[in-house]
C-alpha cells in the first residue's frame, strides 16, 4: 500500500532491511515476496535481517516460493556491530546496534555525493558541445576558440547536499546513540511511551518521545520523525 501511495514501482525495490524479528516488523515479508513474484519480478532481491532468521527464511522460501521466477537471498546481519552492509552507486546502508528484547539494529541510509549541476545558460552562451558536459561536471574548465579559459565555477552550480536517513527502530533509550546518527537529514526514532511512563519504557526496552527528542537534539539532525506508539 505504501508503495502505491508513494507512486513507487515495485521494480525499484532491490533490497529489504529488517531490524529485528518481532512480528510487526517481519510478518509481511513473505506476502510481499509473493506479491513481487505474481507481478512478474525476475531480478534478484536481497533481504538483510538478523542472522538468527536465516534458517527460517530458507524454510519459508522453499515452502512458499517454489513457483517464483526470481532469486531471493538473505544476507545475515550481525546486530551487535556498526558496519556498512550495503553499497551501490548512489548510497550506503550502515547498521547501528540497538537495545531491545532480542537482537536488533537500526539502519542509516546515506546518499553519496553527486556531481554539480550544469548551467545550461552558460553552456549555450559559450557554445560548449554536449560531448564536454561530463568533463565540466567533473571539474574541467573550458577553453574557447580564441584561447579564453572559462573557469569551471562559471559553468556549474553546487550539487545538492547528500541526504541521510537514520531508522532507529525498537530500542530502549541509549544515551550515546546521538553520536551514531549525528547530523542526519531525517531521524526516525521509536517513541512507544510518553515521558510519564519512562520506567515502563525501560522495562520493555522501548523509548519515550522525550528521549527520542533528546537524541535528535544532541545529534543536530534536520528533522525528527516519531513512531511506534503504544495503544496505552
Regions inferred by a protein language model and the residue ranges of each:
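Short internal beta-strands
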Residues: 45-52, 223-225
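A conserved acidic, glycine/proline-rich C-terminal tail/linker
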Residues: 226, 230-232
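Metal-dependent phosphodiesterase/nuclease catalytic metal-binding core
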Residues: 78-226
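Active-site metal-binding motif and surrounding structural segment of the metallo-beta-lactamase
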Residues: 1-48, 76-78
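Phosphate- and divalent-cation-binding pockets in alpha/beta enzyme and binding domains
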Residues: 2, 28, 56-57, 176
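Short active-site segment of divalent metal-dependent hydrolases/proteases
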Residues: 23-24, 173, 231
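Conserved beta-strand segments of alpha/beta enzyme cores
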Residues: 46, 71-73, 92
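A glycine-rich helix N-cap at a beta->alpha junction
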Residues: 64-78
Amino acid at each position: 500500500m505504501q508503495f502505491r501511495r508513494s507512486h513507487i514501482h515495485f521494480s525499484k525495490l532491490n533490497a529489504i532491511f529488517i531490524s529485528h524479528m518481532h512480528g510487526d516488523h517481519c510478518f509481511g515479508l513473505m506476502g510481499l515476496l509473493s506479491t513481487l513474484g505474481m507481478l512478474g519480478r525476475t531480478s534478484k532481491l536481497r533481504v538483510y535481517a538478523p542472522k538468527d532468521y536465516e534458517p527460517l527464511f530458507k524454510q519459508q522460501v522453499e515452502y512458499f516460493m517454489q513457483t517464483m521466477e526470481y532469486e531471493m537471498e538473505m544476507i545475515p546481519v550481525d546486530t551487535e556491530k556498526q558496519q556498512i552492509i550495503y553499497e551501490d552507486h548512489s548510497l550506503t546502508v550502515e547498521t547501528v546496534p540497538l537495545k531491545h528484547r532480542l537482537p536488533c539494529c537500526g539502519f542509516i541510509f546515506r546518499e553519496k555525493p553527486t556531481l554539480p549541476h550544469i548551467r545550461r545558460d552558460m553552456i549555450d552562451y559559450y557554445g560548449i558541445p554536449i560531448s564536454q558536459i561530463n568533463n565540466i561536471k567533473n571539474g574541467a574548465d573550458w577553453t574557447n576558440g580564441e584561447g579564453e579559459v572559462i573557469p569551471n565555477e562559471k559553468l556549474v552550480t553546487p550539487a545538492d547536499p547528500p541526504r541521510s536517513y537514520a531508522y532507529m527502530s525498537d530500542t530502549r533509550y541509549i544515551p550515546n546513540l546521538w553520536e551514531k546518527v549525528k547530523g542526519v537529514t531525517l531521524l526516525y526514532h521509536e517513541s512507544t511511551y510518553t515521558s510519564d511512563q519512562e520506567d515502563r519504557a525501560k522495562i520493555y526496552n522501548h523509548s519515550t518521545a522525550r528521549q527520542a527528542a533528546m537524541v535528535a537534539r544532541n545529534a543536530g539532525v534536520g528533522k525528527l520523525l516519531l513512531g511506534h506508539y503504544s495503544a496505552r
